[in-house]
C-alpha cells in the first residue's frame, strides 16, 4: 500500500522480505528505552537482516553472537526470496518499478472511491486516469468497472482481466488498470 500512496515511501530493513519482530528476552534488551523497563523498547524490530538460511543468517559468521537475536532465517530470507517469483521481495521490487514508471503513483492526486465494508479503494492521478488501487480486509466484492490487474499481492492474478466485479481474497491487494468508460 505504501508504494501506491503519495509521498516518499519508507521501508525499514526487513520490510521488503516480510521480516517479523523477533522476541527479545530481558537479558538481550539493548534499547535504552527498553532497559528502563518502562516500555518494551524497539529491539524486536531492529534484529539482524536475514540474508540467507545459513548459520548467522548471512549477517554474521557462525558462532558469533550478534547484538540482538536473529529471527527464523530458514523460513524467511533474502536469498530464497530472490528465487521465488511469488515472494514479498519480488512484489516489493515490482511495485517500486511500477511506481518509478508511473508518475501518478509518485505525485498524482489521491481520491477515495466508494468501497464495500472490508475494502478500501482509491484512485491516483487526474480524474480521467484509470489506475486504481484496492485493498481488501474483508470478504466483499468490489464493483470497479472492467479492467486488468497490473500487480497484485496474489501474483498468479497479475494480468487477469475482470468485467466489472472484482473479488479479492482476504488481505489481498491489487493495482488495477481500469478500462475507460
Predicted regions and their residues:
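C-terminal beta-strand-rich structural cap/linker in extracellular carbohydrate-active enzymes
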Residues: 160-181
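Beta-strand-rich binding/interaction modules
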Residues: 137-156
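A short acidic, often aromatic-flanked loop/helix-cap motif at beta-alpha or helix-coil junctions
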Residues: 56-57, 155-158, 173
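A conserved amphipathic helix/loop scaffold
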Residues: 131-132, 158-160
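Low-complexity, intrinsically disordered short peptide segments enriched in small/polar/basic residues
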Residues: 17, 26, 146-148, 159, ...
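Loop/helix patches that line or flank the sugar-binding groove of alpha-linked glycan CAZymes
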Residues: 1-128, 134-139
